[in-house]
Amino acid sequence: MQRIIGVEVEYGISSPSEPSANPILTSTQAVLAYAAAAGVPRAKRTRWDYEVESPLRDARGFDLGRMSGPAPVIDADEIGAANMILTNGARLYVDHAHPEYSAPEVADPLDAVIWDKAGERVMEAAARHASSVPGAPRLQLYKNNVDGKGASYGTHENYLCSRDTPFASIVTGLTPFFASRQVICGSGRVGLGQSGDEAGFQLSQRSDYIEVEVGLETTLKRGIINTRDEPHADADKYRRLHVIIGDANLAEMSTYLKVGTTALVLDLIEAGVDLTDLQLARPVTAVHHISHDPTLRKTVALADGRELTGLALQRIYLERVSKFLDREADRDPRADDIVAKWAMVLDLLERDPMECANILDWPAKLRLLEGFRNREGLAWSAPRLHLVDLQYSDVRLDKGLYNRLVARGSMERLVTEQQVLDAVTNPPTDTRAYFRGECLRRFGADIAAASWDSVIFDLGGESLIRIPTLEPLRGTKAHVGALLDSVDSAAELVDQLTH
């Protein structure tokens, strides 16, 4: 299987020494501190190229109007605008009041795990460097999606899809899937409702913030299916499915199955497999009901009158993917591995969700919380449980509860720590992220700006030179590796590419 995938995570941020600190300011400090520690001075830090971005274009065929206002800030060090492009092809920047790591494009779900996990190491270093600045507040970063005060911030997935596939088919095929996949990839949350005031535990941190079936916006009226039509690639050939319903995962199996199963269901949809019989009667309500039931026994209503659990819905998707793959002449090892792990996890969850406490986030978190509740005699309404929930997602290797579970062998990993550390500084080799990252590594001082689909060189002439990268599977090591090795300067590279 080969589908371009990208994961972007807004991290929670706090300053224990200065609780009233402005999060936009502290997020800016984190990004700038990481840049300084990486030895990238302000004058040489590549800017993000916003010219080709169109975040208000809707896949349903219209643009959401943007109210007139001041021009966007262009000073990359201004508060709230800090940005850097990393040599691994990722983007590290301030998005609203959060530091965000947007991983480079990958073509394999396991690589999505590796470069997403690399983002955790980047953020841990960013907080550490920012906190070491004399007089600066101590920062802590969390890979989660809620602040405990009613606000949610996103972990977004991106999948490159064929423009030929009707968007209505994507909505039909994915809505029941997204509603039910949280049984596997929910990260777990103490509290019910957006503010978390109602006592209890639920599967997903994001579900209570889903309010409509389909929508363009990502900060209010969030939809099960997001309609942003901004492919960051050849728009005549591709669309980018922008997924906002997912949680920030720490468990590698959760991330692997989250992106891997979604990619396989997209294969079904693009092949024209009929999934209309799985339509939900009340999709938004189903999202909430499935999340609020850690027993996994409650059912949701389908449009045809059937009642199914989230597990049962996932089982149907698994069966249809398996049947689809059985028709393929050449078996794909990655697809087979995802299907095998998908089936294994569903079997374990059906028998006892706690059997997944060493591989999935929400059961791991629930086991920690239940142990703490039993030792301390706490009800689910106890405020201390919210602190345990938060500490699970702390990115510090010695403090975060998830990381401590890994250290003592209580959470299984799918990748090695060396693979993750290599990915902090190196790009994937089989997507255009390789070209972007290697250009930054070799010729960073000569690059004025970059984006997902272009690299802009400043060679000292009257005009900047934009090299488009509209094909995500070009610009790979196989495609441009020898060329990059054969040139000694950015000018020579640009000359080779343009003549």
UniProtKB/Swiss-Prot annotation:
It comes from the Bacteria. It catalyses: [prokaryotic ubiquitin-like protein]-C-terminal-L-glutamine + H2O = [prokaryotic ubiquitin-like protein]-C-terminal-L-glutamate + NH4(+). Pathway: Protein degradation; proteasomal Pup-dependent pathway. Signal peptide: none annotated. One of its GO terms (molecular function) is peptidase activity. Mg(2+) 1 binds at E8, Y93, E100. ATP is required for the deamidation and depupylation reactions but is not hydrolyzed during the reactions. InterPro entries: Pup_deamidase, Pup_ligase/deamidase. Transmembrane segments: none annotated. GO terms for biological process: modification-dependent protein catabolic process; proteasomal protein catabolic process; protein pupylation. The keyword Hydrolase applies. Pfam families: Pup_ligase. Keywords: ATP-binding, Hydrolase, Magnesium, Metal-binding, Nucleotide-binding. Its cofactor is ATP. Its EC number is 3.4.-.-, 3.5.1.119. ATP binds at G6, V7, E8, V9, E10, S102, A103, N158, R240. Mg(2+) 2 binds at E8, H156, H242. The active site is at D95. NCBIfam families: depupylase_Dop. Specifically catalyzes the deamidation of the C-terminal glutamine of the prokaryotic ubiquitin-like protein Pup to glutamate, thereby rendering Pup competent for conjugation. Also displays depupylase (DPUP) activity, removing conjugated Pup from target proteins; is thus involved in the recycling of Pup and may function similarly to deubiquitinases (DUBs) in eukaryotes to prevent or promote proteasomal degradation of certain proteins. Belongs to the Pup ligase/Pup deamidase family. Pup deamidase subfamily. This is Pup deamidase/depupylase.
